[in-house]
Regions:
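N-terminal Lys/Arg-rich, disordered targeting/topogenic segments
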Residues: 1-12
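Extracytoplasmic/periplasmic/luminal assembly and interaction segments
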Residues: 56-105
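Structured, soluble extracytoplasmic/luminal domains of envelope-associated proteins
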Residues: 84-135
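Asparagine-centered strand-capping/turn motif at beta-strand->loop junctions
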Residues: 40-49
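Short coil/turn motif common to extracellular beta-sandwich-like domains
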Residues: 33-39
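Hydrophobic membrane-insertion alpha-helices, especially the h-region
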Residues: 13-31
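Short, ordered, surface-exposed loop/turn motifs in non-cytosolic proteins
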Residues: 48-57
Length: 136
């Protein structure tokens, strides 16, 4: 026959085991559902096709080469920040009609595991191929 004390101990062990299992599941869901990374959105609000853009880290490593964005269209990229070593930033580069390179800071400061969102709006392109860019 099981005494009352043994019954309470078994009941407490069962409750603790269920709570531990629940916590493990909750931690797993949060870890995989809210993974770190930056979402970069680039929207071409002009009437011209934009070509040859690059998203790069400040240290020079290319993240994504964008061959073109059609007029009134947008693209989104998810950048995994878990592989970043040390401090960094995300830069958008392009060239004007004369081949002169320009850089726009998309994310000013970044470290491993950071997350967030940055919206890049290309509102105009002048006759020289320079962009009027707004970043939010």
């Amino acid at each position: 026959m099981v005494s009352r004390r043994e019954f309470i101990i078994k009941k407490n062990k069962t409750i603790i085991s269920v709570l531990v299992a629940f916590l493990i599941v909750v931690i797993g869901v949060f870890k995989f559902s809210f993974s770190s990374g930056y979402k970069i959105s680039i929207e071409n609000k002009t009437d011209k096709t934009i070509a040859n853009l690059e998203l790069k880290y400040k240290n020079g490593n290319t993240i994504k080469t964008i061959s073109q964005i059609e007029p009134k269209k947008s693209l989104e990229y998810n950048i995994d920040t878990n592989s970043i070593q040390g401090e960094n930033a995300i830069i958008l580069t392009y060239k004007d009609n004369k081949g002169i390179s320009y850089e726009e800071s998309v994310v000013g400061y970044l470290e491993k595991g950071y997350s967030g969102k940055s919206n890049v709006f290309i509102n105009e392109i002048d006759n020289n191929g320079n962009f009027g860019i707004e970043i939010k």
